[in-house]
Each structure stands twice: as C-alpha cells, then as structure tokens.
Amino acid sequence: MKTELRSCAACGEPISDRFFLEVGGCSWHAHCLRCCMCMCPLDRQQSCFIRERQVYCKADYSKNFGAKCSKCCRGISASDWVRRARELVFHLACFACDQCGRQLSTGEQFALMDDRVLCKAHYLETVEGGTTSSDEGCDGDGYHKSKTKRVRTTFTEEQLQVLQANFQIDSNPDGQDLERIASVTGLSKRVTQVWFQNSRARQKKHIHAGKNKIREPEGSSFARHINLQLTYSFQNNAQNPMHLNGSKAGLYPTHESSMDELSQDSSVHCMPSEV
C-alpha cells in the first residue's frame, strides 16, 4: 500500500526526504523552514516563532513584536531588569524623571503625566506651580541667590543590575563586600556605600509606611495623583502564550485616579507564540 506523501508548507512540494520538520502543525522540508524576514535557515535553531502563519527567527520576532522600552523604544530582552509604571515598561536605567533626568529608585514616589515620568518634586512643581528649593534660595532682602547644586551620580543599567542583585542578597554589606561590588561596577567605594545606605533607608521607610498607612485628607492633591511605589522585575521567558493585543479590563481600578499602586514584582512576557 502506497503511503501518501506530506506536502511542504513552504514550497507545496511533496516531502520524500527521510527527515523533515514539524512546526505549528505543518510539515516542512528542512531547507524550506526559514525566517520570513531575514530568510535565515531555522532547521538547526532550537526554536522559532509563528505569528499569523508566518515563521520568524527569535531576533526578528523580538524586534517586531517583543516588548519595547517606553523611553528609548529599544527592545527588552528576557534577561533585562525592568521597571513598570501602569502599562508602560522601562529599562532600569531609562526609568528617570523626564524633567531633571534623575534615575528613580525602588520605593520612591513618582507620577505619570501623558506617559512622561516625573519625580515627586517636579510633579508638584508642574501641577501646583511650585518651585523646588534645590535650585535657588532667597535671602532676607528678597534677592535670589544661587545655591551650590550637589552633583548626582548617574548609574548605568548594568551598574544598577549589580547593585540591586547584591542588595537582595545582603542589604548591609561589610567593607570587603563593598570593595568587591565597587570593583565590579566601576564605582568608588564611597558611592557604593551611599547607594546601599539610601536603599536601606528607602526600604525601611517603605515597610514602615505599609504598616502604618494613614489616609490623606481629600484636599491633598499629591495623595490624589501620586501613589505609585517603584518596583523592579526580572523578565522571564513566557511559559504560557499571551495575547499581545488582549483586553486590559480588570487590571487597574475603575475609580477616577491618575495613578495606581504597584506593590509586587512582575514579569513581562515578551515572547509568545514560541514553538
């Protein structure tokens, strides 16, 4: 009895080869399975991606359909540390105040205005017309005088990853560990020490605030508009496919408020449809 040959999903020709590929419920000649964009062969790849019956290599799928940073618009890989603000996702180093450029830390309050991230000081300055005291002061005669501005240290994404990872292991490292971390990050021991001190203070304040929540008066504009706490998350490869264009109903409160509260780490599933 003659067995009917399978047809290749790419070229449509019968498959008489001893070996062939089964992808997405279809059969392929080994040499016919290629990325629809770059045309690279996929027969020796560990995985590929299918979307609307088109086959993609990992790089092209990530470039076209993967999660992207809301600040720099570059792709976010599965190994990137990220920060979330509502439905927006940012690289760790990209999450900074749009006004002053200062990177925001875990536990620090911020606001979103038209998808722009603002620190607490510049948010209040924007909505209430106030001024921050860090830029200029006023003497007794009413004349303004400039204050010496403290130089802020800006950390790279890689440095923040190392610092955050070590903080999770030990929030109060000794001198030897501080020297090791400083050597790895390329920072001075003093800067590293101050970063850990500030992180411990923010952590303590955040924990204390969680135990002693006091309801703000209704007239407090900051209580109405800013109640986001920064969290960080480590992206994992998606184990279960998710719809990129799915409805977001139920993810956020329905009451009228410009901000939501993030209290847990979460992951971004940027690689659905992997086969």
Swiss-Prot record:
Start and end residues of each LIM zinc-binding domain: 6-67, 68-129
Q: Which GO terms describe its cellular component?
A: nucleus
Q: In which tissues is it expressed?
A: First detected in neuroblasts in stage 9 embryos. Expressed in all 10 abdominal segments and in the labial segment during early embryogenesis. Expressed in the stage 14 developing epithelium. By embryonic stage 16, expression is refined to the abdominal histoblasts and salivary gland imaginal ring cells. Expressed in both larval and imaginal cells between the salivary gland and the salivary gland imaginal ring, in late third instar larvae. Also expressed in specific areas of the larval wing, leg and eye-antennal disks.
Positions carrying Phosphothreonine: 126
> GO biological process: any one?
regulation of DNA-templated transcription
Looking up SUPFAM superfamilies in the UniProt record yields: Glucocorticoid receptor-like (DNA-binding domain), Homeodomain-like
Q: Which UniProt keywords apply?
A: Developmental protein, DNA-binding, Homeobox, LIM domain, Metal-binding, Nucleus, Phosphoprotein, Repeat, Transcription, Transcription regulation, Zinc
Pfam families listed in its UniProt record: Homeodomain (PF00046), LIM (PF00412)
Quote the subcellular location field of this record: Nucleus
GO molecular function terms attached to this record? DNA-binding transcription factor activity; DNA-binding transcription factor activity, RNA polymerase II-specific; metal ion binding; RNA polymerase II transcription regulatory region sequence-specific DNA binding
Region (Disordered) location: 253-275
Does DNA-binding show up as a keyword for this record? yes
Q: Does the keyword Cell membrane apply?
A: no
Return the annotated DNA-binding positions: 148-207
Q: Which domain of life is it from?
A: Eukaryota
What's the stated role of this polypeptide?
A: Probable transcription factor. Required for the establishment of a subset of imaginal tissues: the abdominal histoblasts and the salivary gland imaginal rings.
Q: What is this protein called?
A: LIM/homeobox protein Awh
Originating organism: Drosophila melanogaster (Fruit fly)
